[in-house]
Amino acid sequence: MDEIRVTILTASYNRAKLLPTIYKSLQRQTDQCFEWIIVDDGSQDDTALVVKAMQESHKVEGFPITYLYKENGGKHTAINLGVKAANGLLTLVLDSDDELPEDAVHSVWTCFEQIRENERIGGVCGYMAHRDGRMIGRYVSDGLIDADTRQLQYQYNVDW
């Protein structure tokens, strides 16, 4: 395992049935220099068992999977706990009903490498798509955009 450059952080509440889909999309990543932290926000389903099964089947190689449990307090508290446990230089929040295209970790890291010395930039984001590949929202640019949230909304007409 190479160094952990990216932490993929998933807050989960009663999403045991959805977590294997994320896991499969993470297994397909072309860049495996990441960890996956799952923060269980007080689930009452089989989340702990599902994560344990994924951890057991994944022991030999690949990215580490960390499971943290906390009493229900809302997604924001789960994210905060996960960030404290993160080992990556970057943190990518991946919702429990999402999945990533196979080059996502590589793409995010490549973008970060281009801007990492710029202290004005605090994050990297990209397009979202439906599972069938249709883009959510509208196309803005082929290249990088240096903009704050107001510019994205009013100059580039990006809806949140």
Per-region residue spans from a language model:
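Nucleotide-sugar donor-binding/catalytic module of glycosyltransferases
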Residues: 1-160
